[in-house]
Amino acid sequence: REFLELLTAGILAGGHVLLEDNPGLGKTTVAKAVARLIAGKDGPLVFKRIQFTPDLLPYDITGVDIFDPETRSFRFVPGPVLANIVLADEINRTTPKVQSALLEVMAERQVTIGSSTHRPPEPFFVLATENPVESEGTFPLPAAQLDRFMMRLSLGYPDRETELSILEDNPSENALNALKPVLTFEDFLAARQAAAAVFCHPDLKGAAADIVRDTRIHRAFVLGASPRAGLHYLEALKALALVKGREYVTDEDLAALAVPVLAHRVRLRDPRAQAEKHIREICLARLEGIKTGA
C-alpha cells in the first residue's frame, strides 16, 4: 500500500520514478495497470516498454525520419518514448549516449529529430528500472539523470499472505486487460491541480528546504541534493497529502518522502555506507527542531 501511495503521488506531482528492484517483482505489471486505470483523451493511456541493452541506439527510443519514395519526402516514425507511460527497463544497461536521449524527453518533454521537435502526449510519465544485484555490463546513471527522477522506490518481496494469494489467484494478462479506467482524463488533470493547491505550512516548507540543504554539508556525503530536489520534495509532499485524503502537508509526509526523494541524488563518501540511514537522521533532526521550536 505504501508503495502504491508513493507511486501515485509521483504521478500526480508530474514526476518520473526510478524502481530499484530485482527481476520478477511486478514492475511491468504495475506500469501496465497504471496505464489501464487512467483514461486518456481517446481511450486508455498508451503504454510502451523499452528494454535497454548495450547495442541500443538513440533513435531506437526517440524515433527516426524515414525517406518515403512515394512522396519523396521524409516521414517521422515515432519511437516508444513518445507514449503516456514509458517503462524503461534496466536503464543502466545502455550507453550514456542513449541515456542522454531519454534524459532530453524526461527533462524537456520533447524529442528533437533533425530540425523537428516532437512532444509526448499528456500525461507523460517515465517509470525506469535498474537491477541492484547484477553489475556486469552496466553503465551507472550520471548524477544529472538521477536528479531528473522525482523518486526512487522499491517494491520489495511480498509477505507470505500476499505471495500465497498470488499463487492461488494466478493473475494473468487477461485480468490486467480487464481493468477499466477509474479516472477520466479531466478528473486526472483536476487531481493534479488539486495536488498543487495543497497547503504546506511555512514551518514544514522550511524544514523541507533545510533537510535538502543539510545533505550538502553532511559529513557522509561528497555530493548533496540539488535545488531541483527541493522542488520535487515539495511537489511530492503536496501530492502525497492529497493521496492520503488531506488538504495539508504533515510532518509524517516529510518523513515518508525524505528517503524516496533524496537518497538517490546524494553521493556517499564511503561507498559501503547507506544513504537512507543518513537521510532519515537528517529528517528526524529537523522534525524534532520543529516540535521543540528550535
How would you name each of these model-derived features?
Residues 49-80, 137-146:
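Conserved AAA+ P-loop NTPase core
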Residues 1-3, 198-199:
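Dynamic helix-loop-helix/coil hinge segments at AAA+ ATPase domain boundaries and subdomain interfaces
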